[in-house]
């Protein structure tokens, strides 16, 4: 794995530029690339299942993505979706996935962390 964390302070508009740059650099070194872009935020408190569904639904709507499946993995609420506008995808069973939302409550900080990834979040929950 090669993981690069980039903190964007003025918005996420440049995200695709950084993704292209990472692919280009890794390909120049002959490294087969699989780039995942993830954005993380937090909401105060322990969100209810209903609120998680509402927030993830709004996020998917903004991306033009359709839900493939949702579920609970350990203590995390997980949404797998597909958006025609996102180029890369992975297959899970017969379904293509390229948008992944995970939400989990952090007791120490008292917040629900929300992670939006394309094509899929591939780190520990």
Set out the residue ranges of the language-model regions.
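Extracytoplasmic beta-rich ectodomain segments of secreted or membrane-anchored proteins
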Residues: 1-49, 53
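One face of beta-strands
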Residues: 2-4, 35-43, 79, 95-99, ...
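A structural detector for beta-sheet-dominated domains
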Residues: 3-9, 40, 82, 104, ...
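Soluble, non-membrane globular domain cores that form compact, hydrophobic packing
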Residues: 13-34, 56-67, 103, 118-125
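Residue-level signal for the start and early helices of compact helical domains
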Residues: 30, 70, 81, 107, ...
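Intrinsically disordered, low-complexity segments enriched in Gly and acidic/Ser/Thr residues
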Residues: 42-95
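A cross-kingdom marker for long, charged
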Residues: 86-125
